[in-house]
Amino acid sequence: MDTRTNGKPQRDANLEDVLERLKGGHILRYHTRPDCSDGQNVAAHTWRAMVILQTLWPDLSKNALLHLMYHDIAESRTGDIPATTKWDYDRLAVEVAKIEFKYNCELGVNFPVTDKEKDCCDIADKLELVFHCQRMYLRGNYLAGDIIVNGRDYLDHKYRGRPHYDIAKNVLIELLDNDLNPSE
């Protein structure tokens, strides 16, 4: 019996933990905007966001990667509530955050990160949204344009002036600097 983690035997009892954690990856994104989904689920989004995080900030801690890896896992309990809905309904956002925190604690996936790491994870998360929707846009799905603009504006308003945002800002400028920029 392997007892390397918390003295808990590594047998069938852990299968439930694995399955519960994997369940979050099956949640479909953009359910309120299915025209922009392209079938993307949380697992695909998270992998892409982690690639962005590790590429732009390769020296961040393992906890930062784990924080991002599990950032949407609670959606298997709450559903994927759009960020714009949470922005419009502050009390809802607070209650959902409580549910997500409790669920993450139950699963043991709350990883301590610095404020900078938390920012970088959020930036990578939103950059992935912009990359995904820009890909849709460039394939002729102009319905994704407003999501691109909202994502770009969110990042610029929230992180402008913070040194760790500069690299992401440059990526956004390069990504959106073409004749098909949805803000034009």
Regions found by a protein language model. Give the residues of each.
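Alpha-helical, largely C-terminal catalytic domains
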Residues: 1-184
